[in-house]
Amino acid sequence: MDKYVAISIMCRDENEYLHEWIDYHSAIGVDHFYIFDNDSQTPISETLKQQVENGLVTVENIYGVGDTMRQQRSQSEAVKKLTEYTWVGLLDTDEFVVLLDDSTNIKDYLKQYEIYGAVGLNWLLFGANGHEHKQESIINSFTQSCPSNGANKHIKSFVRTKSFINTDHDPHFMSTIHGTVNVDLGVIKGPFNNPPILDRKMRINHYVTRSMEDYNQKRLRGPGDGNGEKKITKYSDNFFKAYNNEDVQNYDIIKLKERIDNEN
């Protein structure tokens, strides 16, 4: 098995989204997935039993409500455990990496950044597409993007393991020996890349609300890092409205999937 790029996530009770998320990222060339299961009611190791057995997925169980640094500590732990990989992406289950140029393999993109410590990809936020209820496919069902939303300045990073120092300050930004750049090689010194780069090389589709039903469950569940009531309050009606006030249809990820299917 190739060991060039892995992705790590932390989640709780988001099992239903994992198959599509893993299948998609496997199709674009991700070699391994390291998942922190934060006390899910149905263990993720059961949901992904086949993927765990064939070595595609590693699940580590963690328990209980954490503090504000829980996600950062888990990210650091994942990178340190995955040093046989050149790159580790630190994402969430509602984030999908989109390749915007000709290649359908993420390895072709990451090889361009091997002298740097990390590459930061901007979010492009997506809303609910008017869906009240859960949909079978996130990728095919949610095409309502929000390109003008100020939160698109946020990045998520792929970090080169040999350059990694820590994620002590922010889950959106890694401290590295060789620094972080955006996809155009501009220097990034914090959790934002502004103006965001949304139309070339790589970005992250962030399906922040999914449907109204998904969103209401998210409000009850709280964040995947288990920070409890303190952070559940951020998922308000106004939060939902903020990510559903634009309707710019974006099909980039669907077109990428079609290119992959045509190659196979």
What are these regions (language model features)?
Residues P43-L90, V98-L99:
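Active-site-proximal specificity loops/subdomain of glycosyltransferases
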Residues D23-H32:
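Short, acidic, metal-binding catalytic loop of nucleotide-sugar glycosyltransferases
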Residues M1-D23:
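N-proximal low-complexity "stem/linker" segments adjacent to membrane-targeting elements
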Residues I9, F36-S45:
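Ser/Thr-glycine-rich phosphate-binding loops at phosphate-binding pockets of nucleotides
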Residues Q72-R73, L99-N264:
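Catalytic-site signature of metal-activated, phosphate-bearing donor transferases
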Residues N38, D92-F96:
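Short acidic donor-binding/metal-coordinating loop in glycosyltransferase active sites
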Residues D31-D39, E60-G64:
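Short beta-strand/loop segment that forms part of the nucleotide-sugar
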Residues D31, T86, G117:
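Short acidic/polar active-site loop segments enriched in Thr and Asp
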